[in-house]
Amino acid sequence: MLKLAFITSHAPSLTHFRGQLIKMLCDKGIQVFTFAPNFDDETRMAVQSLGAIPIDCSMSRAGMNPFVDILNTWQLARLLKRIHPDIVLNYFIKPVIFGSLAAKWAGVPYRIAMIEGLGFIFTPGPTGFSLARRVLKRLVMLLYKLGLSCADKVIFLNPDDQNEFIAAHLLPPSKTFLLGGIGVDLNKWPFTPPVVESLTFLMVARLLREKGVEDYVNAARIVKKINPQIRFILLGDLDDNPGAITRSEVQAWHDEGIIEWQGHVPVQPWLVQTSVFVLPSYREGVPVSTQEALAVGRPVITTDVPGCRQTVADGVNGFLVPVHSPELLAEKMITFMQHPELITSMGLASRQLALEHYDICKVNQRLIQLICSKTSKCGQCPPSVAAS
C-alpha cells in the first residue's frame, strides 16, 4: 500500500484546505498520515473521519530559534522513519524548509514541497524593504535553498513566486510545478445573485497590514463621504504576526462607523449578502477567500500583485488597482456605485472564471497525478504529468 504523509505547521489547514484531497487519496487506497503540531480534539477527529491518521509533531509556526528548529527536524525525521512513507508533501514555510530536510534524513523516496505564498518577508512596504526585512529575506532565501534542495518537486500557486525562486537560483525550473489556486468546492459555493440595490463591500482576511486592511478602511472613508449608506464589512480574526492590526485599531474603525467588523465568522452567509468582494493585499499565493468570492459570483477589486492579479481579468470580472493606493481603490468602488449593472455582469464573469480555473475537483486531480507520478505502487492513479 502506498503511504503518503502531509506535514504542516497548522493543523486546522488539513481539513479546511486539504480535506477533499485527503479523502480522495484515502478513497484510492492510499494510506495517509498527517503531521502537525497542536492537534485539538475536533481537528483530530475530523482528520480521522477523512480516513487519515493524525500524528502530533513539534514545530514552531513562527519562532526563529535555530536550535529548536534543528531539534524538531531531527524528531520529525525519527517519526517519519517509523512509518516509512513513500511520499511526503510539505506546505507552509517551516514544513517546506524543515519538513523537506526531515524527509530527506528519513530516506523518504519522493518529497514534494508546496509554496502557498511568500508572506510579509517578501512583501515591500510603502517605502520599499527596510534593512531588517532585507536581512531577514536573505536569511529565509538561504533556508529555502537548503530545504528545497531536499525536495524532488516544488509546487507554486502563481508564476511570480515560481519565477522569483528560479531567478534567485533557489531551484532549477525542472523541479517546479505551477498549480494555480488550490480551488474551492463549486457545489458548496454555488452562484447566488449579487446584491445590487444596497451596495455592500466585503473584505475577508487575517487582520494584517500586508493584507491591505488599512487601505480598505481608508478607501471606505473616501466613499462614505459621497454616500454614507454604503456598507463596508470586514471579516477576519486578530493575529500575533509582526504586521498585525491591533484590537484597539479595528475597534476604533468599527466604532467610527467606517467598517463593520464581524471578527472570525463563517464567510459564506456574508458573501451572499454582498455586492463586491475586495482584497487590497500586498502579496498572496492565490487567496482562497477570493476564489470563494468568484465561485458565488461576486465582482472582485484586488491589487495588481503576485497571487491577486491571477483572480481578476481587469474590466471583465472586476478591477485591478496598484498596491498602497486607497484613493484608486475608492475610485473603483465608486464605479460600482455609479454603474450598478456591472455588479451583475462582472459577477457572472467571476463565476465563469471559477468554473474554468478554481474547481477543486480538477485541481486535486492534477495534484494526485503529480503525487503518483514517481511511484509504481499507485496503480489506480492517472498517468504522470509533466512539470508545468
Language-model features and meaning:
Residues 55-56, 137, 141-191:
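Donor nucleotide-sugar binding/catalytic pocket of nucleotide-sugar-dependent glycosyltransferases
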Residues 236, 245-264:
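Nucleotide-activated donor-binding/catalytic signature segment of Leloir-type glycosyltransferases, i.e.
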Residues 35-41, 204, 231-245:
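Glycosyltransferase donor-sugar binding loop
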Residues 328, 335, 342-357, 363-368:
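A short, well-ordered alpha-helix in the C-terminal region of glycosyltransferases
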Residues 299-302, 312:
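Short hydrophobic beta-strand element within catalytic cores of glycosyltransferases
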Residues 282:
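Aromatic "clamp/platform" in nucleotide-sugar-dependent glycosyltransferases that forms part
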Residues 15-20, 199, 203, 208-222, ...:
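A conserved mid-protein helix/loop that constitutes part of the nucleotide-sugar donor-binding site
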Residues 314-315, 319-326, 335-340:
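Conserved acidic donor-binding segment of nucleotide-sugar-dependent glycosyltransferases
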